[in-house]
């Protein structure tokens, strides 16, 4: 199912259905960023605002993008503080952000839906200030190799969303090509699947 239609439909149950990857991503985001403060944050793929709520507590200004209008509608209901702004965006196109304007960019469970990683890293590098961070959390490619992908239930049916497999080296090479250095890296398991491949891969790159 194409990405925009899928997430518009998924928005109705995204916050309530069982989703270990969503829950683990929220936990890892908080662990990676807790204790730091950022004057300006751009969130790529904010969804229903599951991480926006947290980002609002560590950022003086937050701009949150998403490709799904219905996901954005949920996020706007959830996060109403004045220093958070939501906007529709197609991140495969040039981003509507001034150069060197942002201290933190977060990209959570988004890049499996993007074919060209280089464009994303190029736009992030252009938007970040010197010393700024790019946090990327993604479904681990080991899970993808086994057939796992973004999906949700529609009654008795399972709806799978269009995805692309990106190896860990692809993230690192795309970052290096655009002048970003790897600062932190982790592979993360959910408590329910400790004997299985890691569920998430997490990177922090710095400009």
Regions found by a protein language model. Name each.
Residues 1-36, 50, 54, 71-74, 135-162, ...:
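Conserved class I S-adenosyl-L-methionine
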Residues 104-117:
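A short SAM/SAH-binding and catalytic strip from SAM-dependent methyltransferases
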Residues 96-104:
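A short acidic, Gly/Pro-enriched loop at the edge of an enzyme's catalytic core
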Residues 118-130:
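A short glycine-rich, Lys/Arg-flanked "PGG" loop and its adjoining helix->strand segment in the class I
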Residues 44-93:
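Class I SAM-dependent methyltransferase SAM/SAH-binding core
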Residues 192-207:
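Core SAM-dependent methyltransferase catalytic element
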Residues 163-185:
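Short alpha-helix
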């Amino acid at each position: 199912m194409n990405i925009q239609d899928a997430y518009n439909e998924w928005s109705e149950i995204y916050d309530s259905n069982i989703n270990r990857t969503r829950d683990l991503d929220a936990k890892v985001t908080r662990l990676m960023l807790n204790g730091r403060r950022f004057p300006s944050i751009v969130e790529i793929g904010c969804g229903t605002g599951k991480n926006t709520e947290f980002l609002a507590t560590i950022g003086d200004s937050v701009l949150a993008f998403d490709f799904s209008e219905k996901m954005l509608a949920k996020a706007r209901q959830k996060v109403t503080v004045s220093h958070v702004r939501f906007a529709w965006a197609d991140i495969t196109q040039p981003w509507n952000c001034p150069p060197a304007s942002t201290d933190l960019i977060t990209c959570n469970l988004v890049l499996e839906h993007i074919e060209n990683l280089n464009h994303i890293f190029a736009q992030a590098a252009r938007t970040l200030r010197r010393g700024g961070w790019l946090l990327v959390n993604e479904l681990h490619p080991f899970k993808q190799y086994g057939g796992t992908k973004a999906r949700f239930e529609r009654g008795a049916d399972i709806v799978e969303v269009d995805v692309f497999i990106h190896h860990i080296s692809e993230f690192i090479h795309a970052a290096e090509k655009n002048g970003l250095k790897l600062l932190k890296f982790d592979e993360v398991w959910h408590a329910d699947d400790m004997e299985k491949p890691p569920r998430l891969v997490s990177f922090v790159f710095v400009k």
